[in-house]
């Protein structure tokens, strides 16, 4: 079931809207296209799909991630599977475990995000690799040295 969600903030009610797009979402193959078709790389891995997530009240990495979110959808959107808004003073954490082959000596591994809402800090193996501020702007991090 694919639904998008509109929240009426004035009355605090949730209205579910179904669209042609939302009905076609396949959680096992979410937006698989390369983001810049004219610049395709041969070693590209799309990380859209299910991620673990958690809401917390502290800036420390949570011990448990008790929710599942469908990336690239925002947590407020029903397509994400979360349908919850981040409250003031809360932190939203995403976690995804992947296994990568060690890159060749002259190669680097870049982690690219198409967007993040305002402030994001990326941890690789629990070490901060990059911090980004700027809502809905793309950013990248060279994570080779953190692997």
Predicted regions and their residues:
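Accessory beta-strand-rich segments of carbohydrate-active enzymes
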Residues: 12-15, 19-23, 31-33, 37-38, ...
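Residue-level detector of alpha-helical hydrophobic segments embedded in or interacting with membranes
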Residues: 27-32, 67-70
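N-terminal helix-cap/turn-to-beta initiation motif at the start of protein domains
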Residues: 39-48
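Juxtamembrane "anchor/assembly" segments of surface/extracellular structural proteins
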Residues: 70-72, 76-78
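Histidine-centered catalytic/metal-coordination loop motif
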Residues: 66, 78-86
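Predominantly extracellular/luminal regions of secreted and cell-surface proteins
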Residues: 49-71
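N-terminal amphipathic/basic-hydrophobic helices that include classical n-h-c signal peptides
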Residues: 1-13
